[in-house]
Amino acid sequence: MTADQELQIIVRQGKEPNPTVQDERNSVSSSQAEVSHSNTYKRWLRVTLYTFFVISGQTVATILGRVYYDNGGNSKWLATVVQLVGFPVLLPYYILSFKTHATTDRDGKRTSPRNRVLVYVVLGLLVGADCYLYSIGLLYLPVSTYSLICASQLAFNAFFSYFLNSQKLTPIILNSLFLLTISSTLLAFNNEETDSTKVTKGEYVKGFICTVAASAGYGLVLSLQQLAFLKVLKKQNFSEVMDMIIYVSLVASCVSVVGLFASSEWKTLSSEMDNYKHGKVSYIMNLVWTAVTWQVFSIGGTGLIFELSSLFSNAISVLGLPVVPILAVIIFHDKMNGLKVISMILAIWGFTSYVYQQYLDDKNLKKNHEITTTESPDPPEAEESTWQSK
């Protein structure tokens, strides 16, 4: 046999896959697929939990805010404080969980303290002002009108996300935004009003303008949070999410407390408690649980930004807005009419459209990952065999 023939045989043998090596590759590929499937399952489990936090927290907190005003509460700054001051309930969980996540959170470059403080202060100031504007709107507007204007936060968020987060507005997403907005818009045509205190035309206009501004501010805050995770903090992990919630809430709470004392509303709190319709205990419990439920909403909203995007977080928030009139049927004995039913159906339809878009994105990402894996070059076994023959 000539040297050329021997070399051809060796090259052919090198091209033929080694059964042992092939089995190892199949085993590795199978393990990677199982890990990927497990991670996807855990991710969507977290998304489901965060979604429940957003809807339940926002719904209960809004109902409690309405109860506070309807039963004699009148302090706009106190209503702002309770939206923000509940963050200390997270500290025990944050401390206990820090050690568990510390090993993975130390990887990567550290953000400079100056940039980190700047992010928390700017977002905290915006959140504090935003919550105050929402408090004014809830005081002067009917729930149906308030829900209508709050739905506009989704459009504002889509606008800011397009410029700040490079969010692609696909036809499915646009359909989702349209349906979610219409679902809350229908509530404006509801002629049935609650027994809330009558307001003047000037107060109504003030509440309308403040709620529009608050909706725009909320959409901006969500986009800025997502931008901060990607560009400034440059890490998306448990610690960053908890730090974002706690420190932003701390700054915003300081802003609201300063506003409470600067406006002199704190002087009327004692008489407000004494004259509260259901007594002092009910007054205190209302404030405490309002603070807790708003913090649950904050956890869910920030978690959805961390897992998906600010636009998805806002879509879930808008989905929960029609739930408030539904619960009002049970709590305040309001009547359920056709508009409320249609509103809920459209909200669920819009939410389903957005989830379907997320499913398509994940499917395409997984397909691209599989293509990249299959196109990776094999180890140069043939070359090694050839050089050994020489």
UniProtKB/Swiss-Prot annotation:
SUPFAM superfamilies: Multidrug resistance efflux transporter EmrE. One of its GO terms (cellular component) is membrane. GO terms for biological process: purine nucleobase transport; response to nematode. Keywords: Membrane, Transmembrane, Transmembrane helix, Transport. The chain crosses the membrane at residues 44-64, 78-98, 117-137, 140-160, 169-189, 204-224, 241-261, 287-307, 312-332, 336-356. InterPro entries: PUP_plant (IPR030182). Belongs to the purine permeases (TC 2.A.7.14) family. This is Probable purine permease 10. It comes from Arabidopsis thaliana. The lineage of its organism: Eukaryota, Viridiplantae, Streptophyta, Embryophyta, Tracheophyta.
